């Protein structure tokens, strides 16, 4: 009694494949952790412990460090942007080298000041497509956010203020976009 047509068999295979993919994404989401980090904790240690898909929730305070992000994670501070990631005035304060990274509700400052070295508060490498930078203060950097080939990235609703001590021709842009198809810069306050 159970005779299936070629179309029904083909459809059944696709339905099973779709179910397996959906189940796999739900399992990955189910195992994503929220890691609470205080200003007294070592933020780089927390980043090293985080797994792909995890969220680092930063408490208010100052985190004197630079970050190299090499896995798809979210780093999120309080809505008032009182989690401050402060660089040491060399290089990039936050360098993102993984896809699907989100930075939200932070204050990022004190990158290096070399335009030729592409110093920036937040630097998105081409290996970091679909990055999302939102609701973040990016202050006192050479370049605020540098999208260096990170396709389909979004920089939205941020406040970006350049390093005022530099002469105008030594200052970088609030946001620089280079070779990043689909990148969007939307509703930012840049000065």
Name every feature range the model reports, one short phrase each.
Residues 72, 78-82, 100-110, 129-140, ...:
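Right-handed parallel beta-helix
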Residues 44, 48-52, 63-76, 84-129, ...:
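Extracellular beta-strand-rich solenoid/capping regions of secreted or surface-exposed proteins
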Residues 27-45, 60, 78:
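Right-handed parallel beta-helix/beta-solenoid
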Residues 1-13:
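N-terminal secretory signal peptides that target proteins for export/translocation
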Residues 17-29:
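Bacterial N-terminal signal peptides
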